[in-house]
A protein has these predicted regions:
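Covalent nucleotidyltransferase
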Residues: 275-439
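Phosphate-end processing signature that detects enzymes handling 5′-triphosphorylated RNA
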Residues: 1-253
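Short helix/loop capping segments that flank catalytic or ligand/cofactor-binding pockets
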Residues: 162-164, 171-174, 207-210, 295-297, ...
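Short amphipathic alpha-helical molecular recognition features
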Residues: 146, 191, 208-215, 313, ...
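Hydrophobic, conserved cores of late-appearing folded domains
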Residues: 190-192, 203-205, 228, 238-243, ...
Length: 656
């Protein structure tokens, strides 16, 4: 975690104050408003567990806050329920304290990390304290805010990391509570949960400001690495500069790499279908790694950054000026195919768009010497030199990157063993007019690799990349085995009648052997479309389209929107339904539905990767494999493109 000298000095002073005042609490919060989204919350929890930190679930608690910062806390579910019913503290075990700022300048905002370090003063109060007794005399009239907190604590060597799911009294735009007098004035349990992460510095007898500060920065850095999903942290200001440089190089704000289509039967049959790509007509094949698709962008200094499809920027801490202002396409792999997986850091390059100093090579054919077919009777095209191919340029780029001792390490703590390893994918080339591509595909499938692969990518040897950013490369095709052939759906949980927030829970018998009785929730599955979906309009009673009421924008461009999944070929009336049994956490009693492979809780309105098993009963055929954190994050920022699969992609996968 890089800090400016002024920031470091301010933190040191706050730590020094904290050491000299035992009643002070020094804590760090994350997010612009002290909150993070559910996806980030889960990502941090996963990182902490992967690093070996044990989570200690705590009892649910209800905190009642007054405008004067007096906090009453009730523990245990039974006591909380009793208060919610009678709105009185009488006869209930509670603790009370006053918590406020220690000094007028008691907080430091690290805006580049959306992090706030603050010193608060806590003072426990007795039940017979005059202030407490005075509050109780007018308790029904007192303005209050309620926070129901479910918390997990991680002990991290001298700091405690608290992760909390909170349902609270609503807030005004100013951030102040919308105060209430009775718990029943607002049904707090129906409010959407918020997610909070705090790092609290713990007192030690031998603390010095320097030692305690290192401990704090280490704990804060650990959380930030979970938030940024990367070991090497990046400041917000640096991210803005990188995206500006990327825009200057590519002339777009979009992800420059193309989208590809799913391989279908007509793409490999012996009898050609007019205007249909066929992998027998001069294609190469490589493996499809199970990683994060990223552009590898090298800025004018030679610093390498990875940029994912959501335009999130990841710093590598590596520099090679010989490759300045270049752009490659690849997959960032972070785990091996061992059981359980082990962490690795590999960026596997499979294409190149711009070589050093921004030289555009995207219009080159992929294979050296490959040429596009010409009409019968026309003169054969000139064969380009080997260097006028993307495969040649790709290999040259990777060779230059790893030349001699490799790139220069620019970040303290990064070592040759822990730095990002950059390598080129291995390609096997088929010849046009025969079945050699199938032998090449077999070689790819049987080759041993340290990372998990979930399919094959077929690329035409002679074609250039699409000129437009984020365009579909219609001739580039992906194939996945049946168990990995998946669709990324937007999932929306079916709600109780009359409610917009409460999920509908059904008790029923799951069809099949055994007739198991289960409580389950139902997910509705959505894909993206530019067209009006007739089934969606009829079943959901939407307005019918007409000339003055269509899905077109003011400029006549169709709106890309979620529609219920309705396959046209091989129809299944339950294709857009996914029923999942409810699981219960033995530690907290929390109930949720979860993915099968990664065992992650599934939140409403997230992107979930699902596989289809026709052998299961109707409604139970979709198997959720994992929550697509990267795509869900983009969706929550308001970006719909490249999140849920499009109607066409989902249909291709369904038909394949």
């Amino acid at each position: 975690m890089e800090l400016f000298s002024a920031e470091a000095e301010n933190i040191r002073k706050k730590v020094e104050e904290w050491i000299t005042h035992p009643d002070y609490e020094l804590e760090t919060t994350f997010g612009a408003t002290g909150e993070v989204d559910a996806v980030t919350f889960l990502a941090v929890a996963q990182r902490l567990r992967a690093k070996g930190y044990a989570s200690l679930p705590q009892e649910d608690r209800l905190t009642v806050i007054t405008p004067e910062h007096v906090r009453f806390t009730l523990g245990s579910l039974g006591v909380i329920q009793a208060y919610c019913n009678d709105d009185t503290m009488a006869g209930k075990p509670y603790t009370v304290m006053i918590k406020d700022r220690a000094t007028a300048d008691s907080q430091i905002d690290l805006e580049d990390y959306e992090t706030r370090i603050k010193v608060r003063r806590e003072r426990d109060m007795a039940h017979d304290d005059a202030t407490v007794k005075k509050i109780f005399t007018t308790w029904p009239q007192q303005r209050k805010a309620f926070r129901i907190i479910r918390r997990w604590a991680f002990d991290a060597d001298g700091v405690r990391i608290d992760m909390s799911i909170v349902r609270s009294t609503q807030k005004l735009r100013s951030g102040e509570f919308k105060w209430q007098r009775s718990f029943k004035d607002q049904d707090v349990m129906l409010n959407q949960p918020t997610y909070e992460i705090e790092v609290e510095l713990l007192h030690r007898a031998d603390d010095t400001p320097e030692i305690a500060m290192k401990r704090l920065i280490r704990g804060v850095g650990e959380v930030l690495r979970g938030i940024q999903k990367n070991t090497v942290l990046i400041r917000k200001d640096t991210r803005k500069k990188v995206l500006a440089a990327y825009r200057e190089l590519t002339k777009t704000d979009l992800f420059r790499g193309p989208a590809l289509r799913t391989l279908r039967k007509e793409n490999f049959v012996k009898e050609r279908i007019p205007k249909t790509p066929n992998i027998r007509d001069g294609y190469n094949v490589t493996d499809k790694a199970d990683g994060l698709r990223c552009m590898g962008f090298v800025d004018s200094k030679g610093d390498l950054y990875l940029i994912d499809m959501g335009m999130n920027v990841y710093r590598t801490g590596l520099r090679n000026p010989a490759l300045r202002k270049s752009l490659v396409d690849g997959e960032w792999v972070t785990k091996t195919n061992d059981t359980p997986p082990k962490p690795i850091q590999q960026f596997l390059v499979f294409d190149i768009l711009q070589a050093t100093d921004g030289r555009d090579v995207s219009r080159f054919p992929f294979e050296a010497g490959a040429t596009m077919p010409v009409e019968e009777g026309a003169a054969p095209p000139a064969v380009p030199p080997p260097e006028d191919s993307r495969h040649f340029q790709l290999k040259a780029w990777v060779s230059t990157w790893n030349k001699d001792d490799g790139p220069k390490i620019m970040v303290n703590g990064l070592t040759p063993a822990t730095k990002l390893q950059v390598a080129a994918k291995e390609f096997f080339f088929g010849k046009a007019g025969n079945d050699s591509i199938f032998r090449m595909a077999s070689r790819v499938l049987t080759a041993a690799r340290p990372y998990y692969t979930d399919g094959l990518i077929f690329t035409p040897n002679a074609m250039p990349l699409p000129e437009k950013p984020a365009a579909t490369f219609w001739e580039q095709l992906k194939w996945k085995p049946a168990h990995d052939n998946t669709v990324d759906f937007l999932v929306i949980t079916e709600k109780k009648t009359g409610s917009k927030s409460q999920d509908k829970v059904i008790a029923g018998i799951k069809p099949g052997p055994g007739g198991e009785t289960v409580n389950y929730k139902t997910l509705r599955l959505y894909v993206g479309s530019n067209d009006d979906n007739a089934r969606d309009i009829i079943l959901n009673r939407r307005e019918l389209p007409r000339r003055d009421r269509t899905a077109y924008g003011s400029r006549g461009k169709k709106e890309y929107k979620p529609v219920i999944f309705t396959p046209k070929e091989f129809p299944d009336p339950m294709a857009a339904i996914c029923r999942l049994p409810i699981q219960s956490d033995p530690d907290t009693g929390e109930e949720y539905i979860m993915t099968a492979d990664s065992e992650e809780p599934i939140q409403d309105k997230t992107i979930v990767e699902m596989a289809y098993d026709p052998a299961q009963p109707p409604g139970w055929r979709w198997k959720p494999l994992r929550v697509r954190m990267d795509k869900t994050e983009r969706l929550q920022r308001g970006t719909l493109s490249r999140t849920l699969n499009s109607e066409g992609v989902a249909e291709d996968t369904w038909n394949s």
